[in-house]
């Protein structure tokens, strides 16, 4: 199966299942491998639009699990659930973090956010690292032993992020789900068992 047919497979599967995007199967693979949602009663989804990861959490986690979904774009209006709190704003902005803080602490922080790509690997990798830093700015909203999962483009910056997180989490690794395009440089950082306050 070539790259484009494989991508089409995941997109068609997502549409048939009622999910907003094919990326839902990346989270499903992460959850299967790391049991992300097994103990999560409060989840923060950063860069959530159009909403497939939020859909997955609401449909898979325990019935009592609450989700705070953040994006500068509105989350799909037909995703309706009493457990869902929407926060519209730039995830990297201080005022957005202040609004999210009202819902903390979280057992799990998720982010599938990615920068607009230019086709220049160096530029795109750097932009991804900057966005990842914005996601990591929320880490102190985690409860003890909480988890953090986010997308980053592979490169020297991503290795530096892993090194930084290992000082604050009991287990840190990276993973490329089967639903990722084979030629994509995207990886997902999985940090588990938060030890406490993480300095900037």
From Swiss-Prot:
Family statement drawn from the similarity comment of this UniProt entry: Belongs to the class I-like SAM-binding methyltransferase superfamily. RNA methyltransferase RlmE family.
Annotated S-S bridges: none
Gene3D superfamilies for this protein: Vaccinia Virus protein VP39
Active-site residues, record numbering mapped to chain: 151 (proton acceptor)
Main function: Specifically methylates the uridine in position 2552 of 23S rRNA at the 2'-O position of the ribose in the fully assembled 50S ribosomal subunit.
GO-annotated molecular function: rRNA (uridine-2'-O-)-methyltransferase activity
One GO CC annotation: cytoplasm
Compartments it resides in: Cytoplasm
InterPro entries reported in the protein's UniProt record: RNA_methyltr_RlmE, RNA_MeTrfase_FtsJ_dom, rRNA-MeTfrase_E, SAM-dependent_MTases_sf
Name the UniProt record assigns to this protein: Ribosomal RNA large subunit methyltransferase E
Catalytic activity, EC: 2.1.1.166
